[in-house]
A protein has these predicted regions:
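Short acidic, S/G/P-rich loop/turn micro-motifs used as interaction or catalytic elements
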Residues: 11-13, 34-37, 63, 82-87, ...
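Conserved Rossmann-fold NAD(P)-dependent oxidoreductase catalytic core, especially the SDR/UDP-sugar
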Residues: 74-89, 94-133
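Hydrophobic anchor at the start of a short beta-strand
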Residues: 28, 149, 210
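Mid/C-terminal beta-alpha module of Rossmann-like enzyme folds, strongest
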Residues: 198-277
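N-terminal Rossmann/SDR dinucleotide-binding element
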Residues: 1-70, 250
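NAD(P)-dependent short-chain dehydrogenase/reductase
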Residues: 131-196
Length: 277
């Protein structure tokens, strides 16, 4: 892959993917969601990228309302996962994204063989036909026009840059009262570096599939929670998901869960931003 567009380039997964692809020599159009308050960590992320001639940062509002350059074989990643976890889905401006970008550029996507990949929370599958029908309808239209659209449904992702909304982050940051967010999926977990390697390796051969990504380690979230001495309910049942619409793919764990968590701890300690983590 020579070039990618990452919508949500400063979100947890979007940024981790952006940094990895830049290290691979890929050219990146990094689109960052404009929010009422800019996260203090965004500047830290800019510093982590540094002066890179292959990185072009763009504001979401300006980008979605302007004439965008779409290049042959572009891969477009749209990170919705983080917005869901942080309860900031309004920042996506779904109607504009669909009408002003996805549908408006349909012919161009087809002619230029563009591939699109959505990064979504696993909870999206709980009521895929009703709650998220507008986006699902747009995806169906794109696929009907032979445009490659892949959807990756993700459990808890952990590691460096994980947002403070996650219980793992809170425990590692020594927050006294750790709260398990109702939007946190406690039935599985994947280490960020393993997810990014998977996304990077499959980006050139995206087949327009819908995939539920799962860890190769059974009870991965629970193992992490026990390592961090989190208090959680063992009796929480995994909700029914619309699995009939997706392919399940196991992500191989490259490091022991404890090593992944300690990497996250070291990263938290390396960044000192009041209220920024």
């Amino acid at each position: 892959m020579d070039r990618a567009v990452i919508v949500g380039t400063f979100e947890f997964i979007g940024f981790s993917l952006c940094k990895h692809l830049l290290e691979q020599g890929c050219e990146i159009d990094g689109i960052h969601y404009n929010k009422e308050k800019e996260d203090a960590l965004i500047n830290e992320k800019r510093l982590a990228i540094g002066r890179n001639a292959n990185f072009y940062e763009k504001n979401y509002s300006s980008w979605i309302n302007s004439k965008r350059e779409i290049i042959k074989n572009d891969v477009i990643f749209i990170d919705i996962y983080d917005l869901y976890i942080k309860n900031e889905l309004a920042s996506l401006r779904e109607k504009e994204l669909i009408e002003e970008f996805l549908i408006k550029n349909l012919d161009e996507f087809k002619d230029l063989q563009v591939k699109i990949a959505f990064l979504l929370p696993i909870q999206w599958l709980k009521d895929i036909s009703r709650t998220h029908s507008r986006l699902e309808d747009a995806i169906d239209i794109l696929r009907e026009n032979n445009i490659s659209v892949s959807c990756f449904y993700l459990p808890v992702i952990y590691g460096p840059w994980q947002p403070k909304e996650f219980s793992f982050h809170q425990a590692l940051a020594n927050i006294k009262r750790v709260k398990i967010n109702e939007r946190e999926w406690i039935h599985d977990a994947i280490f960020i570096e393993d997810l990014i390697c998977f996304l990077s390796n499959c980006s050139d051969k995206l087949l327009g599939e819908s995939c539920l990504l799962m860890s190769s380690v059974t009870g991965h979230w629970q193992k992490c929670a026990d390592y961090l001495s989190l208090d959680y309910n063992n009796n929480w049942d995994s909700p029914d998901l619309a699995k009939g619409k997706v392919i399940e793919k196991a992500i191989v764990c490259s490091v022991k869960y404890s090593e992944g968590l300690e990497k996250q701890r070291s990263h938290i300690l390396s960044i000192e931003i009041p209220d920024g983590l």
